């Protein structure tokens, strides 16, 4: 995953009280981190290596150890992880990713966080969803990782949604392809937290409407369907979604059918949501992000209103 920005069923739960980790033991030394990073870059001959692609992208200085406290299959090809990060200095903005350091694996992974910042604040937990590939970090997640495995994480990325209370209200259009849903789900969940906060306290950031366009090969590969529809039903006047499948071969179940469109997300669907109050966040394969960012520019959407992240 590289960043370019122009501005569970059966999931095992955990709590800080259930797994105690001393904060002092969660830090990697700077020399150790430098060794891990340089080793990864030198040993990887892939042009798509996460550390190489994101070398110029801003990162936080804090590197925190984390313990796997939950895992589940989100689809036939995607496994989700819950990580307990007890370090109180560890934080992130909705949409950002982590460098993922695995003991014994020289290659550093790069995975977007799909949970909201609020979950970290309340439970010291972040969630990731990792697609199966031959990349060593992904192979480790799918074939080796078990409960209580220890890793280290560092936050990075310039693709995020982090409004402040006094900021102007904005609508959001989120455009996701495949596992590109991960950072956009984090943003969607953060938006829902802001809506709840506003409803309960009558203050804080006043967010506009949120529309999610999400495309995958078939309904089995549409990740987090229940989470997304739960938010749509919780905030029917604020959150809407359009789920697209491009190679569906089985019957679509009745619960999903009202939200499903067979075929790709179209330019017209996106164009209908253009306004001066709308921010666009796009995450998916490079051809998809290139297409929609270009179409938005052609329709005179300011570049500062278009944020995108590419997945390889």
Curated annotation (Swiss-Prot):
The keyword Oxidoreductase applies. SUPFAM superfamilies: Ferredoxin reductase-like, C-terminal NADP-linked domain (SSF52343), Riboflavin synthase domain-like (SSF63380). It is an enzyme of class 1 (oxidoreductase). Residues 1-17 form the signal peptide. It comes from the Eukaryota. The keyword Signal applies. Its EC number is 1.-.-.-. GO terms for cellular component: mitochondrion. Keywords: NAD, Oxidoreductase, Signal. GO terms for molecular function: oxidoreductase activity. This is Oxidoreductase NAD-binding domain-containing protein 1. The gene is OXNAD1.
